[in-house]
Amino acid sequence: YVKGGTVTTDAAGGAGLFAYGDGTVYAADTTIKTTQDTSGGIHAAGGGKLYAWDLNVETDGESAAAIRSDRGGGTMVVDGGTYTSNGVGSPAVYCTADIAVKDATLTANGSEAVCIEGLNSLHLFDCDLTGNMSDLSQNDSTWTVILYQSMSGDSEVGNSTFQMNGGTLTSKNGGVFYTTNTESDITLKDVDITYNNDNEYFLRCSGNNNERGWGESGANGSDCDF
């Protein structure tokens, strides 16, 4: 249990707070700052559980989501706070777990806002969500929220779920929702959505030719309930 204070890391893979396996983390009113790659702000994997209240979290590295989960999944419950990621490939929320967030500000300054992979779910209630993904040559699209299956083994294959009730969704570059190589459910209610001037699409459900190998081209489409 952590209450108040500051957690800082300056090492690759140096998560701020990490719950793994049978471990459970409780944290409240704490400031967390990570600076290097693969260093999530708050992180759960291998079935770990993490509960957070009113944290101030910022990450600077690549592949360093502010709210991060990883192989083996787990449970993350977040109430209040500010979560900011600044690196490329660092969403505000990277979801390979069951994650619920309420009354929080979630901002990705150099990445998509949300990434959900495989049989996992993200539920947002009255949150302010912002993404600013760069246009990258290895991708055949640019998005703000993605639901997909990467085939990396980080998540079980299955239905990806995104729910947003209330709050705001701001897309600063590219399209809004992109789902590929998976089944997915997207549910929105009372969400104020702001598009960028170069918005490519609101919802794209398709196969892909992504250079990172998200399924086999021609057999990696999406079955989406919106």
Regions found by a protein language model. Name each.
Residues 14:
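Blade-loop segments of beta-propeller domains
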Residues 1-10, 18-35, 44-62, 68-86, ...:
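Surface-exposed loop/turn motifs in large extracellular/passenger domains
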